[in-house]
Structures are given as structure tokens and as C-alpha cells.
Amino acid sequence: MNVIEGVVATPNARVAIAIARFNNFINDSLLEGAIDALKRIGQVTDDNITVVWVPGAYELPLVANVLAKTNRYDAVIALGTVIRGGTAHFEYVAGEASSGLSSVAMNSDIPVAFGVLTTESIEQAIERAGTKAGNKGAEAALTALEMINVIKAIKG
């Protein structure tokens, strides 16, 4: 039986981070967590990390797609925060961001890590950006690194 598992130490990985500016008071913490995980745990160098700011979570799939198509990156990490309000806007933005990023991953053959918080409140978002519930930006970075190695192992 063959078992393929990825490791997170990936010193030569080239990683792009697409991050939404909207809700940046939360997203800045997600970015800090992602960069810390890439550098400290993944051993990725500054030169191999590219950060691209976009207006909001809805724009993340387009930019992730463009980044993936450049063939300059081994993975893309998407970071953002969508907080439920009093209208259906939350469902549209969260759903399209999720489905769009999934589509990019499926069509590009590189990992697209989903670090977009979809929360009921600002408090929940803050908890997931580095307080009570860990840092989902760091988790997305570790997912991206592990998936880079899983895909490399599968392809041989």
C-alpha cells in the first residue's frame, strides 16, 4: 500500500497571498499569521512570498486565477473576511468567493488555500484571526504548504 502525505517545510516554495482590503482590521492579522507560518514553519523566504491586495473578498477568485495562470507560484492563499449583515449580500459574497476559489484550484492544478472567514459577527472574526480560535491565516498557509508537497508527491 502506498501512502502519500505532505510535509509543511517547503523552503523553495513560491507562494502568492491574495488578500482583501475590506475588513482589513481583521485581515491584517490573517496576513501576519500566514506570513509567520510560511517563514517560521514552512521556511519560505521573503523573496518567495508575494502579497496582492484586492478591494474585497468577491475579487479574490479573479486575482487568484490570474496568479495561478502566471506559473510563477506553487500555491495561492486567499485571505479575507465576510461578516453577516442584515441583507443577503453575505450569502452572495461568501458563496461566490468560495466557489470561485475552488474553481481556480480545480482548473489550475496548484493549491488555492481558503483563508476567508465567513462569520456571524465581528467578534467571531476577531476570534478566528488570532485570539481564541487560532489564526485562520496561519492555518491556510500551512494547508497550502502541505498541499504543494502532496501534489508534488502524486506527480512524482
Swiss-Prot record:
(2S)-2-hydroxy-3-oxobutyl phosphate binds at G86, T87, R128. GO terms for molecular function: 6,7-dimethyl-8-ribityllumazine synthase activity. It comes from the Bacteria. Its EC number is 2.5.1.78. Gene3D superfamilies: Lumazine/riboflavin synthase. Coiled coil: none annotated. One of its GO terms (biological process) is riboflavin biosynthetic process. It catalyses: (2S)-2-hydroxy-3-oxobutyl phosphate + 5-amino-6-(D-ribitylamino)uracil = 6,7-dimethyl-8-(1-D-ribityl)lumazine + phosphate + 2 H2O + H(+). InterPro entries: LS (IPR034964), LS/RS (IPR002180), LS/RS_sf (IPR036467). Pathway: Cofactor biosynthesis; riboflavin biosynthesis; riboflavin from 2-hydroxy-3-oxobutyl phosphate and 5-amino-6-(D-ribitylamino)uracil: step 1/2. Pfam families: DMRL_synthase. The keyword Transferase applies. SUPFAM superfamilies: Lumazine synthase. The active site is at H89. 5-amino-6-(D-ribitylamino)uracil binds at F22, A57, Y58, E59, T81, V82, I83, F114. CDD domains: Lumazine_synthase-I (cd09209). One of its GO terms (cellular component) is cytosol. The keyword Iron-sulfur does not apply. Keywords: Riboflavin biosynthesis, Transferase. NCBIfam families: lumazine-synth, PRK00061.1-4. Catalyzes the formation of 6,7-dimethyl-8-ribityllumazine by condensation of 5-amino-6-(D-ribitylamino)uracil with 3,4-dihydroxy-2-butanone 4-phosphate. This is the penultimate step in the biosynthesis of riboflavin. Belongs to the DMRL synthase family. Forms an icosahedral capsid composed of 60 subunits, arranged as a dodecamer of pentamers. This is 6,7-dimethyl-8-ribityllumazine synthase. It comes from Yersinia enterocolitica serotype O:8 / biotype 1B (strain NCTC 13174 / 8081). The lineage of its organism: Bacteria, Pseudomonadati, Pseudomonadota, Gammaproteobacteria, Enterobacterales. The gene is ribH.
